[in-house]
């Protein structure tokens, strides 16, 4: 059978919090089968757990948060969640000694390295996939996102930014998902923001960890980062990274096709909740052997050479 995945060992790293600008220690621990993805704040006494759950997601101006019934939150979970989706990690405990996951370089790549360094362990329990049976679509003005039946995981994302640094030919990206394609083509794409917005937020005591080290920063005319872009279409690739993380908030890799126009965290989450609420539109499936399973979800192989 195709088995659930966790880590082989504990792995730890430090980084900076996007909101506070302070050092954050991140510890990722193996977890038993059927635990799911659990974020944990150890700066609170007693520590507070936040299971990854579409209904717990709140989208703020700066990041995605998970919020519990007491309005306690953990922030900036989206890029780490994308790395978990990319490598198909089903069960993990993620501890931070702060109200937020460190922003690292603004992409999912540092988290991918950490997870691969810890190693991936298969558990003796069947991995459950969420497979689309019907198309579900959500809209917000001219923005929209949909999931439809497809034997694999295919993503097609279009952005529409009228900015000199973002050429019109680099505003759409399509991906046939696999662990390898995620690591090579998506995980390194960084988040982005306007210099004027960062300066304004920092003047109000917000976004204190925001810098050229953790984002693509643009002014009205150009990219300000000395090293430029990692991909000519890095902006849309990062929006796809966000979507992969947002959709994994259900705790399961999705078998289906995701298509979006100008979508963001809030609309991605609205789509996921709409799918989950329409029980006839999806089903959980398991696979007895690799031959039955879509190629998209084969265990990561060549990514270690990346």
UniProtKB/Swiss-Prot annotation:
GO terms for biological process: lipid A biosynthetic process. Its cofactor is Zn(2+). Keywords: Hydrolase, Lipid A biosynthesis, Lipid biosynthesis, Lipid metabolism, Metal-binding, Zinc. It catalyses: a UDP-3-O-[(3R)-3-hydroxyacyl]-N-acetyl-alpha-D-glucosamine + H2O = a UDP-3-O-[(3R)-3-hydroxyacyl]-alpha-D-glucosamine + acetate. One of its GO terms (cellular component) is membrane. Gene3D superfamilies: lpxc deacetylase, domain 1, lpxc deacetylase, domain 2. SUPFAM superfamilies: Ribosomal protein S5 domain 2-like. Its EC number is 3.5.1.108. Belongs to the LpxC family. This is UDP-3-O-acyl-N-acetylglucosamine deacetylase. It comes from Yersinia pestis.
